[in-house]
């Protein structure tokens, strides 16, 4: 019976990714995520941003099962980061943006996250030296590199993605 568990998990993971992929394909030109009084991302925009994050994760050495922390206000980019992390096969570590900096540091350290994506309001209160296990910290709204402790590049703000044909 215990041999079924990995197969069930793999099937559920594949189903989730297929569900996201099909949603994007079937709604390509429709609105997907909107910030309150802000920009709206269509499904095609979400797909391109997910692809960009996947490239950043790969180039950063993130592997399936690695942890990626995210701490910022609810936004379309928070949603994109969440979807990109899960579809990449990494584990998302969501942290409430209302937490005090010490609590954020403790959660990041305890989770053994390799990357942290933060919102600008959160970043101004954090101390990167209090999170020594992180390999990189990126700004959530545009994926720019804030801190890198790796020889690997972790941000590609200049990256232009190819046109995705679905």
Where are these regions (language model features)?
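Structural core segment of the AMP-binding/adenylate-forming
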Residues: 59-60, 87-153
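Active-site-adjacent beta-strand anchor residues
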Residues: 10, 36, 71, 116-119
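Aromatic/hydrophobic pocket-lining residues that form π-stacking "cages" and hydrophobic walls in ligand
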Residues: 81, 126, 157
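Conserved AMP-binding/adenylate-forming core of the ANL superfamily
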Residues: 21, 29-83, 100-105
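Flexible, non-catalytic linker and terminal segments flanking ANL/adenylate-forming cores
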Residues: 1-14
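Conserved small/polar residues in nucleotide/adenosyl-binding loops
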Residues: 157-163
């Amino acid at each position: 019976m215990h041999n079924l568990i990995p197969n069930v998990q793999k099937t559920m993971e594949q189903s989730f990714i297929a569900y996201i992929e099909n949603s994007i394909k079937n709604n390509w030109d429709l609105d997907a995520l909107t910030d309150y009084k802000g920009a709206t991302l269509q499904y095609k925009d979400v797909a391109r941003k997910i692809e960009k994050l996947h490239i950043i994760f790969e180039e950063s050495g993130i592997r399936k099962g690695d942890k990626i922390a995210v701490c910022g206000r609810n936004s379309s980019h928070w949603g994109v980061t969440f979807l990109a992390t899960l579809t990449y096969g990494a584990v998302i570590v969501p942290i409430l943006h209302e937490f005090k900096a010490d609590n954020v540091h403790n959660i990041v350290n305890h989770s053994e996250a390799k990357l942290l994506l933060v919102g600008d309001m959160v970043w101004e209160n954090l101390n990167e030296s209090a999170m020594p296990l992180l390999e990189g910290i990126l700004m959530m709204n545009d994926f720019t590199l804030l801190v890198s402790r790796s020889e690997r590049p972790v941000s590609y703000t200049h990256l232009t993605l190819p046109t995705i044909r679905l």
